[in-house]
Amino acid sequence: MLNQFPGQLSNNVFCFPPIESETKSGKKASWIICVQVMHHNTILPITDEMFSTDVKDAVAEIFTKFFVEEGAVRISKTTRVTEGKNLGKKNATTVVHQAFKDALSKYNRHARQKRGAHTNRGMIPPMLVKHFNIIPKTFFEDETDPIVQRKRNGVRAVACQQGDGSILLYSRTEKEFLGLDNIKKELKQLYLFIDVRVYLDGELYLHHKPLQWIAGQANAKVDSSELHFYVFDCFWSDQLQMPSNKRQQLLTNIFKQKEDLIFIHQVENFSIKDEDEALRLKTQFIKEGYEGAIVRNANGPYEPGYNNYHSPHLAKLKPLLDAEFILVDYTQGKKGKDLGAILWVCELPNKKRFVVTPKHLTYADRYALFQKLTPALFKKHLYGKELTVEYAELSPKTGIPLQARAVGFREPINVLEII
């Protein structure tokens, strides 16, 4: 859960990124908000488990640090969080989780206040999809039906209004799009009628155009005025817990305020009762020339993609591709249960390498393989073999297969017999 929040952990204290501004005298000022967990008089290490289970007698403390260059650091009094919220309900929070949510709310509020002249410009990374070709059962457990939308193969973009009234349009990686004047002009008109604090989340796209062409147009400094902005979600930095179905209702109201837009569109929503309906819609969308479908948990919050966090409240449905690639090495996962579990390394004809997760091996088998497979055994039995790989798509930048999973070797090989 820690990776859901911007910032880093140091000496058992989690600090959000500095929000910088400028004093009247022209000096650089920094404001930082931090969270620590106290057990009596001891600072505890913050772990992911604390977001789901309370530690007995532990309290969380929120405090801020403020300093001007060449000046002393001023530390605020701590705000203590002694219990979570919504106890006994599905959306209950622990002490630590609630403290982080409170701190994030204050962080976003402060960032928004400073967004005018001297700021990080209020960029919040958009929510990313976790589930691929799987719709969690939890999506159907609530009274509100999940939402399905067409998946366009375009370039992700988020729009917000700056403190000076200008429009900021930025990418998934928080890079500003400098062109797209046709879209920014309409956004400026739209923001005259709506809450200026709202972020519009969508995709830059033109139907039947390849992603590489779209990316080139999106990043061009000279505006071609061909791309359109398809908005599929909205959020407020201080109301990230607002459920998806309510955000969609507000998004519909936003577009009702100005119905003569040419380059900005609200994505159509479809409610579904079960997974079969979602799959039928996916098939329909693909026939229409789209990439597939996106499924949204109707009660899911907006979870920004800080530290490349992928939200479990989104699922992507699209056809799988497959191809054979040459196996050249092996490695292990880097964190969590993947640490110590074997991963294959394949190579493209241009010598670029990428990691592939074995699809049909259990974690126990993957642990055993990594422990017992030696470089000599790998070179003798596996090096240079063709591996059949399923993947979602090729990266438009590198050509590397994304979300790659190894189905098996082209020639029958039982890797467990090698060890």
UniProtKB/Swiss-Prot annotation:
Domain comment, as recorded: The N-terminus domain (NTD) plays a critical role in DNA-binding, catalytic complex assembly and catalysis.
Function: Very low-fidelity DNA ligase that seals nicks in double-stranded DNA during DNA repair. Together with the viral repair DNA polymerase X, fills the single nucleotide gaps generated by the AP endonuclease. It is not essential for viral replication and recombination. Displays a very low adenylation activity towards DNA with 3'-dideoxy- or 3'-amino-terminated nicks compared to regular nick DNA.
GO molecular function: ATP binding; DNA ligase (ATP) activity
PANTHER family to which the protein is assigned, alphabetical: DNA LIGASE (PTHR47810), LIGASE, PUTATIVE-RELATED (PTHR47810:SF5)
Keyword NADP included in the entry's annotation: no
Keyword Plastid: no
GO-annotated cellular components: virion component
Coiled-coil spans in chain: none
Protein name in UniProt: DNA ligase
